């Protein structure tokens, strides 16, 4: 069939570089599979209907780029030893830290090392906040100079205008 290609009356199976069918010389275009001009040569190389094409294999290459998921779970590998230094955490401590409610022992140890500073971490004293929110409460005085650490949200709230 190679010697009949491109001549009038014989369908030339033309494809682009991607294997897609390309319109013929007379604008006939690509036909549906099985609906082309069937050409049966003597050698039987292309025995069958014209217009049938081999599917192109698509290769997925990432180019060496690692794709990571958006979720992340990290925990510090060291913690305060109470003497101003750091010590490595063991596997047991890391697992306990990830479990919900697994930090019960850590809070008691930290409170014993810190002594009684007057209240647990995260508690806020809202003095004068009885009533229907008249805005006469005292904010900002809940930490004062007692040496308590401020929470992350409290630091943000402190920086917002109009929240005093």
UniProtKB/Swiss-Prot annotation:
Which biological process annotations from GO are given for this protein?
Answer: cold acclimation; response to abscisic acid; response to water deprivation
What InterPro entries does the record point to? Dehydrin, Dehydrin_CS
Compositionally biased spans, kind Low complexity: 105-115
Biased composition, class Basic and acidic residues, residue ranges: 147-164
Q: Give the Gly residues compositional bias ranges.
A: 42-51, 128-138
> Which PANTHER family did the record assign?
DEHYDRIN RAB16B, DEHYDRIN XERO 2-RELATED
Q: Indicate the family of this protein.
A: Belongs to the plant dehydrin family.
Q: Mind telling me what this protein is named?
A: Dehydrin Rab16C
Q: Which organism is it from?
A: Oryza sativa subsp. japonica
Lineage at the top is: Eukaryota, Viridiplantae, Streptophyta, Embryophyta, Tracheophyta
- Whichever gene encodes this chain, its name is RAB16C
